[in-house]
Regions:
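Residues that form or flank phosphate/diphosphate-binding pockets in enzymes
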Residues: 38-39, 65
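Short gly/ser/thr-rich secondary-structure transition/capping motifs
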Residues: 36-38, 92
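Short, surface-exposed beta-edge/turn micro-motifs
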Residues: 1, 50-53, 67, 106-107
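Short beta-strand segments
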Residues: 1-36, 55-58
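Charged, gly/pro-rich active-site loop segments
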Residues: 60-125
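Short amphipathic alpha-helical segments and helix-helix/interface helices
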Residues: 41-44
Protein backbone atom coordinates (compact mmCIF):
# COMPACT_ATOMS: atom_id res chain seq x y z
CA UNK A 1 0.00 0.00 0.00
CA UNK A 2 1.18 3.49 -0.83
CA UNK A 3 -0.41 6.93 -1.00
CA UNK A 4 -0.69 8.72 -4.35
CA UNK A 5 -0.70 12.51 -4.28
CA UNK A 6 -2.00 14.40 -7.30
CA UNK A 7 -2.97 18.02 -7.83
CA UNK A 8 -5.38 19.65 -10.21
CA UNK A 9 -4.48 22.46 -12.61
CA UNK A 10 -4.94 24.97 -9.76
CA UNK A 11 -2.60 23.06 -7.46
CA UNK A 12 -5.35 21.72 -5.18
CA UNK A 13 -3.96 18.46 -3.69
CA UNK A 14 -5.68 15.08 -3.56
CA UNK A 15 -4.22 12.01 -1.79
CA UNK A 16 -5.54 8.44 -1.94
CA UNK A 17 -4.26 5.03 -0.84
CA UNK A 18 -3.31 2.82 -3.79
CA UNK A 19 -2.08 -0.66 -4.63
CA UNK A 20 1.02 -0.62 -6.80
CA UNK A 21 3.61 -2.75 -8.57
CA UNK A 22 7.14 -1.89 -9.68
CA UNK A 23 7.81 -2.53 -13.36
CA UNK A 24 10.73 -1.51 -15.58
CA UNK A 25 11.89 1.16 -13.10
CA UNK A 26 8.40 2.67 -12.92
CA UNK A 27 5.39 2.18 -10.70
CA UNK A 28 2.01 0.92 -11.93
CA UNK A 29 -1.19 1.66 -10.06
CA UNK A 30 -4.43 -0.16 -10.73
CA UNK A 31 -7.85 1.34 -11.22
CA UNK A 32 -9.64 -1.78 -10.04
CA UNK A 33 -13.20 -3.04 -9.54
CA UNK A 34 -13.62 -1.83 -5.99
CA UNK A 35 -16.65 0.52 -5.92
CA UNK A 36 -15.73 3.87 -7.44
CA UNK A 37 -16.50 6.03 -10.45
CA UNK A 38 -13.64 4.66 -12.57
CA UNK A 39 -13.64 7.10 -15.50
CA UNK A 40 -14.40 10.13 -13.31
CA UNK A 41 -11.92 9.53 -10.51
CA UNK A 42 -10.33 12.72 -9.21
CA UNK A 43 -6.86 11.16 -9.47
CA UNK A 44 -7.38 10.49 -13.19
CA UNK A 45 -8.76 13.97 -13.85
CA UNK A 46 -5.85 15.50 -11.94
CA UNK A 47 -3.23 13.51 -13.86
CA UNK A 48 -4.83 14.60 -17.15
CA UNK A 49 -4.53 18.25 -16.00
CA UNK A 50 -1.22 18.00 -14.13
CA UNK A 51 0.93 14.86 -14.48
CA UNK A 52 3.27 15.71 -11.57
CA UNK A 53 2.63 13.24 -8.74
CA UNK A 54 4.16 11.81 -5.58
CA UNK A 55 3.93 8.31 -4.12
CA UNK A 56 4.62 7.81 -0.41
CA UNK A 57 5.42 4.43 1.14
CA UNK A 58 5.55 4.50 4.92
CA UNK A 59 6.27 2.21 7.82
CA UNK A 60 4.84 2.70 11.28
CA UNK A 61 6.10 0.96 14.40
CA UNK A 62 5.42 1.53 18.08
CA UNK A 63 9.21 1.70 18.37
CA UNK A 64 9.75 5.10 16.79
CA UNK A 65 13.37 4.22 16.06
CA UNK A 66 11.91 1.96 13.33
CA UNK A 67 9.74 4.58 11.60
CA UNK A 68 10.41 5.53 8.01
CA UNK A 69 9.05 6.62 4.66
CA UNK A 70 10.06 6.87 1.03
CA UNK A 71 8.62 9.49 -1.30
CA UNK A 72 8.86 9.08 -5.06
CA UNK A 73 8.23 12.17 -7.16
CA UNK A 74 7.56 11.75 -10.83
CA UNK A 75 5.39 12.13 -13.87
CA UNK A 76 2.24 10.05 -14.26
CA UNK A 77 0.52 8.85 -17.40
CA UNK A 78 -2.80 7.09 -17.86
CA UNK A 79 -2.26 3.91 -19.86
CA UNK A 80 -5.47 2.38 -21.25
CA UNK A 81 -4.24 -0.19 -23.76
CA UNK A 82 -1.25 -1.73 -25.48
CA UNK A 83 1.72 -3.77 -24.33
CA UNK A 84 2.66 -1.43 -21.49
CA UNK A 85 -0.90 -1.71 -20.12
CA UNK A 86 -0.75 -5.52 -20.40
CA UNK A 87 2.62 -5.66 -18.59
CA UNK A 88 1.28 -3.35 -15.88
CA UNK A 89 -1.79 -5.54 -15.33
CA UNK A 90 0.46 -8.63 -15.21
CA UNK A 91 2.77 -7.00 -12.63
CA UNK A 92 -0.19 -5.96 -10.47
CA UNK A 93 -1.70 -9.46 -10.62
CA UNK A 94 1.62 -11.00 -9.69
CA UNK A 95 1.84 -8.76 -6.61
CA UNK A 96 -1.83 -8.90 -5.53
CA UNK A 97 -3.70 -12.19 -5.64
CA UNK A 98 -7.00 -10.29 -5.40
CA UNK A 99 -6.41 -8.77 -8.86
CA UNK A 100 -6.20 -12.20 -10.52
CA UNK A 101 -9.99 -12.49 -10.58
CA UNK A 102 -10.68 -8.86 -11.51
CA UNK A 103 -11.23 -7.63 -15.07
CA UNK A 104 -8.41 -5.09 -15.18
CA UNK A 105 -7.94 -5.28 -18.96
CA UNK A 106 -10.65 -2.69 -19.64
CA UNK A 107 -9.51 -0.31 -16.92
CA UNK A 108 -6.68 2.21 -17.07
CA UNK A 109 -3.38 1.77 -15.26
CA UNK A 110 -1.51 4.77 -13.89
CA UNK A 111 2.20 4.68 -14.72
CA UNK A 112 4.58 6.79 -12.63
CA UNK A 113 8.01 7.53 -14.08
CA UNK A 114 10.40 8.18 -11.19
CA UNK A 115 12.27 11.50 -11.21
CA UNK A 116 13.32 11.89 -7.57
CA UNK A 117 13.40 9.69 -4.46
CA UNK A 118 13.53 11.06 -0.91
CA UNK A 119 13.57 8.93 2.24
CA UNK A 120 13.63 9.29 6.01
CA UNK A 121 14.12 7.05 9.02
CA UNK A 122 14.76 3.35 8.56
CA UNK A 123 14.62 3.80 4.79
CA UNK A 124 17.29 6.50 4.59
CA UNK A 125 20.88 5.58 4.25
Amino acid sequence: MAHLATADANGRPHVVPVCFAHMDGRFCIAIDEKPKRTRRLKRLRNIAENPSVALVFDRYDDDWARLGWVMVQGTAAIISSGSEHERGVDALRERYEQYRSMALEGRPVIRVAVEKVVSWGVFSG
